[in-house]
Amino acid sequence: MLDTKKLTHLKQLEAESIHILREVVAEFDNPVMMYSVGKDSAVMLHLALKAFFPAKLPFPLLHVDTKWKFKEMIEFRDKRAKEEGFELLVHTNPEGIEKNINPFVHGSAVHTDIMKTEGLKQALNKYKFDAVFGGARRDEEKSRAKERIYSFRDKNHRWDPKNQRPELWNLYNSKVHKGESIRVFPLSNWTELDIWQYIYLEGIPIVPLYFAKRRPVIEKDGVKIMVDDERMPIEEHEVVKEEMVRFRTLGCYPLTGAVESSATTLPEIIQEMLLTKTSERQGRMIDNDSSGSMEKKKIEGYF
């Protein structure tokens, strides 16, 4: 038996995550791993490749594409799929595309609900997945802090925060009826700093957007938004400036704020994490739609 007392804290976290990944594959018929292309997804993919090496991944990766992701994210996603040879499923809500749902005209709440939440539910119904891996961590946001590692979802993919299953030690309740599912979070006990240290130690590839670089940005409601393509509406009083910025978290580019930074290497990012006093999700505009907005989104089926 593995003596966890002799492991570093990162190796303990790694061992726990690998145990969860293997447990799910043993218990469920049709698991899938969400792949948002961010740093947490990069770590989760790396852990999965380790967990089942030398075999190929026993489940596909799913990316819900809103068509508003950073161009570099899509390029990186396709590159990683080709390098590692995993099965990549990409789904976009066709109704949202038909209605031209976008964050500028319809706002972040409607855009997130239709293109992300409904898009995800469509994909899960289409492929009939009964377990879905996600890269959420408890230190990210208050609604995620109280969520279990095995998070039960009903037939409509809804979460009831008042009716969660107990988790004693490393024992997980995987019982589901037909049509129900479990969202599984192998990185629940990791912190943002843990993620960056692990990426550095393991040499995990990540999207270049995480590193500081001179990028074209405009300021909207006090948030620096990168001008990633010609769809960005620029008002008369707004000026596009080249600034040294990076991203602590990634999503749809019109809803993701950049932070001023000079960190161009992993050690510099880690140093920045040690000194920062702000949340990594401060730049995610979807978190600020209303009070408790993330919990409401999760109850409706969001990850």
Curated annotation (Swiss-Prot):
Q: Entry's CDD domains?
A: Sulfate_adenylyltransferase_2
HAMAP family referenced in this protein's UniProt entry, alphabetically: Sulf_adenylyltr_sub2
Q: Which Pfam families match?
A: PAPS_reduct
Instruction: Tell me yes or no: is Cell inner membrane among this UniProt entry's keywords.
Output: no
Q: Which family does it belong to?
A: Belongs to the PAPS reductase family. CysD subfamily.
Which reaction is this enzyme known to catalyze? Answer: sulfate + ATP + H(+) = adenosine 5'-phosphosulfate + diphosphate
- The organism's place on the tree of life at top rank: Bacteria
Presence of keyword Translocase: no
Q: Which UniProt keywords apply?
A: ATP-binding, Nucleotide-binding, Nucleotidyltransferase, Transferase
Q: In UniProt terms, what function does this protein have?
A: With CysN forms the ATP sulfurylase (ATPS) that catalyzes the adenylation of sulfate producing adenosine 5'-phosphosulfate (APS) and diphosphate, the first enzymatic step in sulfur assimilation pathway. APS synthesis involves the formation of a high-energy phosphoric-sulfuric acid anhydride bond driven by GTP hydrolysis by CysN coupled to ATP hydrolysis by CysD.
State its Enzyme Commission number(s).
Answer: 2.7.7.4
Q: How does it assemble?
A: Heterodimer composed of CysD, the smaller subunit, and CysN.
GO terms of molecular function:
ATP binding; sulfate adenylyltransferase (ATP) activity
Q: Which Gene3D superfamilies match?
A: HUPs
Instruction: Tell me the pathway.
Output: Sulfur metabolism; hydrogen sulfide biosynthesis; sulfite from sulfate: step 1/3
UniProt-recorded name of the protein:
Sulfate adenylyltransferase subunit 2
InterPro entries found in the cross-reference section: PAPS_reduct_dom, Rossmann-like_a/b/a_fold, SO4_adenylTrfase_ssu, Sulfate_adenylyltrnsfr_sub2
Q: Which GO terms describe its biological process?
A: hydrogen sulfide biosynthetic process; sulfate assimilation
